[in-house]
């Protein structure tokens, strides 16, 4: 679990070793189907964060601190379940879930892709009720966000691809994909209405809600084949600004960016961490351009295969965020799938291999699970079919 330098030729990697963070690993499940998405939220209202996983044909949760597994739903949606987001949708004081399902492989860009919400019952051992929200082919990622800065949460949904896109056309020959926001109706069991925020991107693997540049509510950062963009509300209209190029080395292949999160440096300035290109092999950090142009792009690791998750969090309490990366596949015996942490020191970044080969990361999340003030990491594995908790014990 020591810090190392993935590649001396990469411009922002430190060659000096740094003090590694210490984690205790606990495996709480080894029988997932795929484990498409993991979420940390307080399901039962006891002020302790629980773990929620969207699996192939079910949604389950693990109760903190025993990690007893309970089934939320099974077989109530069109498989596969692919994305999940938590919010008290009906206002009864209990946490509910939005769920994207009917994920199809091979990709079907003309039909499929359902969006629904799950209402939590009073009895935690009963399955939850399912209510439809909408449909969009290749429904892939969802997030709750306060888009207008008035405290009202909307469900933002993004498909992977635009309608009628084809493999022959590099999934870019159909209509642009629709990034939509769904307002909760007065009676959420009734039909929901969607607002299209943007319809210009192609192959958007993920997006993140971040503090708005106006100081109220949230903007959206997108990772697509066109690179990194910021979607902001200005004068009542949603405007898309190009922030980063992404990896454009293969214009007819997988390109752009894939996973995305925003972090903070010690001076308070933001940085953006991505996996590039789509399902890519590089960890990239963007920092703002002083002249206001495209952000400066720096590859900090290129020794991975199929990066599939990113998070930014201050793991060591020094006032600056680290980057946590989940890797799905093995590149070599030395560079395996798992969980990696990147820490900034001066002008460089150093890498810590937290778990090399023990979890083929499909998704990960970071939050303080035990109330000790230190963020912990939860990762779910696709090929490994497991859920692992990495409890942050601090520096060695």
Where are these regions (language model features)?
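Sec-dependent N-terminal signal peptides
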Residues: 10-19
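Beta-propeller-forming repeat regions
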Residues: 18-396
């Amino acid at each position: 679990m020591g810090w190392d330098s993935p590649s001396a030729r990469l411009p922002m990697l430190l060659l000096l070793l740094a003090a590694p963070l210490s984690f205790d690993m606990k495996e709480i499940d080894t029988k997932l189907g795929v484990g498409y998405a993991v979420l940390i939220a307080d399901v039962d209202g006891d002020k302790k964060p629980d773990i929620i996983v969207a699996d192939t044909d079910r949604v389950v949760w693990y109760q903190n601190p025993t990690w007893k597994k309970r089934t939320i739903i099974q077989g109530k949606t069109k498989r596969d379940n692919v994305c999940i987001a938590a919010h008290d949708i009906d206002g009864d004081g209990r946490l509910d879930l939005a769920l994207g399902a009917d994920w199809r492989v091979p990709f079907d860009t003309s039909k499929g892709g359902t969006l629904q919400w799950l209402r939590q019952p009073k009895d935690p051992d009963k399955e939850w009720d399912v209510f439809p929200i909408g449909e969009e082919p290749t429904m892939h990622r969802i997030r709750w966000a306060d888009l207008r800065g008035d405290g009202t949460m909307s469900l933002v949904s993004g498909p992977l691809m635009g309608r009628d896109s084809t493999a022959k056309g590099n999934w870019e020959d159909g209509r642009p994909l629709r990034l939509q926001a769904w307002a909760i109706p007065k009676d959420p069991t009734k039909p929901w209405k969607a607002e299209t925020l943007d319809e210009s991107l192609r192959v958007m693997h993920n997006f993140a809600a971040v503090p708005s540049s106006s100081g109220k509510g949230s903007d959206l950062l997108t990772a697509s084949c066109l690179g990194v963009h910021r979607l902001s509300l200005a004068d009542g209209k949603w405007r898309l600004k190009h922030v980063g190029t992404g990896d454009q080395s293969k214009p007819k292949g997988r390109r752009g960016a894939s996973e995305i999160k925003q972090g903070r440096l010690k001076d308070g300035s933001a940085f953006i961490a991505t996996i590039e290109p789509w399902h890519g092999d590089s960890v990239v950090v963007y920092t703002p351009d002083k002249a206001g142009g495209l952000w400066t792009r720096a590859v900090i690791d290129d020794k991975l295969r199929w990066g599939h998750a990113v998070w930014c969090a201050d793991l060591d309490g020094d006032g600056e965020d680290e980057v946590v990366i989940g890797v799905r596949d093995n590149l070599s015996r030395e560079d395996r799938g798992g969980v990696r942490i990147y820490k900034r020191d001066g002008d460089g970044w150093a890498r810590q291999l937290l778990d090399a080969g023990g979890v083929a990361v499909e998704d990960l999340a970071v939050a303080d699970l035990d109330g000790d003030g230190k963020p912990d990491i939860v990762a779910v594995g696709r090929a490994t079919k497991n859920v692992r908790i990495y409890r942050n014990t601090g520096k060695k």
